[in-house]
Amino acid sequence: MINYSIIDKYIDRLIDDTTPDKPIWNIENIKHGKAPGWNYIDGCMMTSLYTIYKQTDKKKYIDFIDKFVDYYVFDDGSIRGYALDTYNVDNLNEGRVLFDLYRETGKEKYKKAIDLLYSQVQGQPRTPIGNFWHKKIYPEQVWLDGLYMAQVFYTRYEAEFNGGKNFDDIARQFQNVYDNMYDKQKRLYYHGWDYSKKAFWCNEKGLSKSFWLRSVGWYTVGLVDTIGYMPDSAKEQKAKLVAIFKDTIEGLEQYIDKDKKMFWQVVDQGERRGNYLETSGSAMIAYAMMKGARLGVVDKRYAKVGEEVFNGICKQYLTESDGKLNLGGICLMAGLGPETNRKRDGSFEYYISEPIVENDAKGTGPFVMAYTEIKQL
C-alpha cells in the first residue's frame, strides 16, 4: 500500500524551494542555463497545483500560483519571455491557469494575457486540412503534444468567452490526428506527421517512425481535458471526442507492463535493449484513465487501471534521499528535427538516447495531475 501522505510533502517541497524566476522543477532550463520565460513546463505544474488548491482549499496553493504567474504577466497583458510571432503552440499551455487566476483574483491583466494568447490561436498557421502547425519553424508539421498544448486552452476560451463558436474546429483537429496518425493495428499514435512529407524524419505517409510514450500521453490528456471543458450543449463535437478517447484508452491498456504496471518509453518495444519504463507518459495515461472513468466517458474499471499505473510509478521511481523525496525515470526532452539536428529522427535509438532525470516538471507535473485524480477515487 502506497503512503500517499508522502506525496503531499513532496509537492510542498517543490513549492517551498521555488521562486518565479527559479522554478526548481524546470531541469531543462537549469541544465542549459536558460533565462526564465513563459513555457508549457511551468504551465503543467500551475494547472496541477490549482487542482490541488480546489481540492484542499489551502490558501498557500493559490497564493503561490498567483505570485508565480504575476511575475510573468505585466499590467498591459504582455508576457515575460513570450513571443507571439514564433507561433509555438507550446506557449499556449500556461495560458490555461490564467482563466482560473482571473476568476480568483479579478486582475484585469490576466484577462488581457488570455486575449493575447487567443490572438495566437487566431493567427496560428495551419495545414491545408486545418490543423495547427506545431511551431512556425516546423511548417506543415503536427505533433501529438501540440493537441494538449493548444486545444485545451482553445476550448476554455471558446467555452468562457466566445460562445463555443469554434468547437467544430477543435473536434476536427483531434479527428484529423486520429484519421492520419493512429495505427489501427497497433492502436497507437505516431509522434509526428508532416503534411507536406518533406521532413527528413517522415515516411511516404508523412509519419515519424516510432510511438513515443510522452507524446501519446500528451495527446490522451489533451483529449480528456478538452472533453472536460467542452459543455454538454456541444453534443456532436463532444461525442466525436469521446469516441476517439475510448478507442485510444482501450488500445493503450495492452501495453501496460504486467509486472511493473507502467508504460515503456517507446511504447510497443517493451524490454528491447535500452528501453525503459518512463514516468511522465505513464503518469499522463494514468491521469487520463482515472479522469475518463470519473467523467463517465470510459468504463469505470479504468479508475482502477489508472490507479495501478500510478502506484507502479511510486514503487519504481519515487525514492527518498537525505530526507527528501525524488521522482525519477523522467525523459528530459525529445522532439523531431529541425533539419540542423538530424539526431532527432524519431527512431527507437533516438528516443532512448535522451537524458533520464529526476524531478523535472515534465514528469512531476503529470505525476501531480494523476495524484489529483487519485484523491478523487
Protein language model annotation of sequence segments:
Residues 2-41, 55, 60-62, 71-89, ...:
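CBM-like carbohydrate-recognition segments
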Residues 144-145, 152-268, 275-283, 301-348:
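Extended ligand-binding clefts on enzyme/binding-domain cores
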Residues 63, 74-202, 337-344:
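Extended ligand-binding groove/face enriched in aromatic
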Residues 32-36, 85, 137, 141, ...:
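Short, solvent-exposed segments of well-ordered alpha helices
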